[in-house]
Every structure is written in C-alpha cells, then in structure tokens.
C-alpha cells in the first residue's frame, strides 16, 4: 500500500482540522492536549477491534529480497489462540512447509505483558525443541527482516504511548502515535505507528534501533474483513533501511474459530507440527 503525504490546498485545510475531527468521531478519545492519554486510548481502541476472535489459522508466503535483488521464498502456516486471561498475551505457532531445508521448523510463542515473552523453536534436523533466549529476540527471524519480537502479540500494556499528530495516509486519516517498549531486551528504542481513524487498523510502523537511528519500516496492505468484525492485512512489507533488504508477507486462507485449544500450543505440539 502506498502512502501519499502530499497535500493539496483542500487536504491541507482538512489536515488543520484533523485533531478536532478525529476527536469528534470518538467522543471518549482524549484531546490533543493529552498526548499520552490520547495515544494509549488509540492503542486500546485498536486492541478492542480484535477481541473475541477465539483462534485463527492462515497460510503465508514469505518473500526475501536482498540488496542485489535476489529473491528467495518460503511458505508457512500461522495459528493463533486468543488468551482468555486479559492480563496476559495470546499464543501463536508458525510452521514452515517450504523450502525443503526448513520444512518442519516451527516456532511457538507465549506473549506476555511486561514479563519476557516465551518462545521455543523446533529444529527438525536436531529433532529437539530449543528455547529462544529473551536477550536474543531482537535478532532476525529465519533470515527475514522481521525480528523474533515482531511476531509476538502486540499487547497494549507492553508500551508507553504518545500521540504525535493526525495526518492523511493515502485516502485515509491516521493517528500517528509513538510507542516505547516497557519490556526488557527490545531491539527498538521506539516505534512510530500510523493507525487509521476509521477502522483503527495499523497502516505503517517505523522502527528505531536502540541508538534511536532509523532502522526499518513496515507497511500494511490489502485489508479484508472477516465475520463482519475482524480486519486482517493480507500483505505486509518490511524494508530494512540499513541492510537494504526487504521481506514481504502475503497471507491467505484465513479461518476463524476453528476449534484450536491450548493443547495445540505446547512444546510437544511443536514436534508434531507438519
């Protein structure tokens, strides 16, 4: 999805009114004079749009492109279980199907709020489950431009928030909110997220490394609505501004409320994932 920030005379006039207009759309949303409260409220509204999904299954194509334009592709499945305990995070599992050299590799994540997320990987070549250290979650996941922590559930309580501005993002209007991780061992000092003010879905996230230097940008596209309630982006594009590499994730075959249970998200189930 492209983002056009060029302002015509008309859109410039509209932009000057955006904070007031966005506030009017959400009567309970704190005003621009309360940037921290406003930023957190936007995150809470976004989170609320996804409550009650139960569980999901989907398939994904991962396209890796290096700085020379060389491309490699991987196929995997992604399962998620909503945690009924609202004080804790969701559970997820990723299973690689292609290419042959990574087939059967699987990662299990238990997301938490401020406690370190728990992550394990099953490596078929070694026939064992390996726990991923909390201090290593800023590293690249399976050679992609996504870090291990990027695949963890983005719980509201993991961050502090500060609303920066409202501005046009493509044909939409977006709230621009700075997030700073409250949990240990993040690879990011902060991220800046663009969330549309209509459906409250993420449109773009810019990541800054621990030294506060621009690191990478994630854009979301091809949103589709499921069960008349749950929005899912079918394409994610991550660009690393340092390595000049990119990773594209293309999602398909989303299914909701399939009957997955906690028994499908254990270390033993990692070994059985095929």
Positions of predicted regions on the chain:
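Gly/Pro-enriched, hydrophobic low-complexity segments
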Residues: 108, 118-122, 128-132, 137-154, ...
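N-terminal mature ectodomain segment of secretory-pathway/periplasmic proteins
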Residues: 27, 34-125
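Sec/Tat signal peptide C-region and signal peptidase I cleavage site
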Residues: 20-24
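Bacterial N-terminal signal peptides that target proteins for export
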Residues: 2-12
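Short, solvent-exposed mixed-charge patches
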Residues: 273-274
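Short amphipathic beta-strand and strand-loop transition segments with alternating hydrophobic
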Residues: 77-84, 162-168, 222-224
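Bacterial N-terminal signal peptides
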Residues: 11-19
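Surface-exposed beta-loop interaction hotspot
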Residues: 153-159, 166
């Amino acid at each position: 999805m492209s983002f056009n920030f060029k302002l015509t005379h008309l859109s410039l006039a509209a932009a000057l009114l955006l904070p007031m207009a966005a506030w009017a759309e959400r009567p309970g949303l704190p005003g621009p004079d309360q940037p921290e409260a406003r930023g957190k409220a936007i995150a809470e509204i976004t989170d609320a749009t996804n409550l009650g999904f139960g569980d999901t299954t989907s398939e994904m194509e991962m396209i890796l492109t290096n700085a020379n334009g060389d491309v490699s592709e991987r196929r995997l499945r992604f399962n998620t279980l909503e945690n009924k305990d609202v004080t804790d995070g969701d559970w997820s599992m990723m299973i690689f199907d292609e290419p042959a050299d990574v087939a059967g590799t699987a990662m299990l994540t238990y997301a938490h709020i401020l406690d370190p997320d728990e992550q394990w990987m099953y490596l078929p070549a070694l026939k064992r489950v390996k726990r991923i250290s909390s201090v290593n979650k800023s590293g690249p996941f399976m050679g992609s431009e996504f870090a291990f922590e990027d695949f963890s559930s983005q719980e509201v309580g993991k961050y502090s928030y500060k609303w920066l501005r409202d501005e046009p993002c493509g044909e939409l209007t977006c709230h621009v909110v700075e997030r700073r991780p409250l949990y240990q061992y993040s690879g990011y000092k902060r991220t800046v997220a663009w969330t549309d003010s209509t459906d409250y879905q993420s449109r773009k996230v810019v990541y800054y490394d621990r030294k506060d230097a621009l690191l990478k940008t994630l854009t979301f596209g091809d949103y589709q609505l499921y069960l008349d309630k749950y929005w899912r982006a079918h394409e994610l594009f991550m660009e690393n501004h340092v390595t000049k590499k990119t990773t594209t994730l293309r999602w398909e075959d989303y299914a909701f409320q399939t009957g997955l249970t906690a028994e499908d998200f254990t270390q033993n189930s990692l070994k059985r994932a095929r």
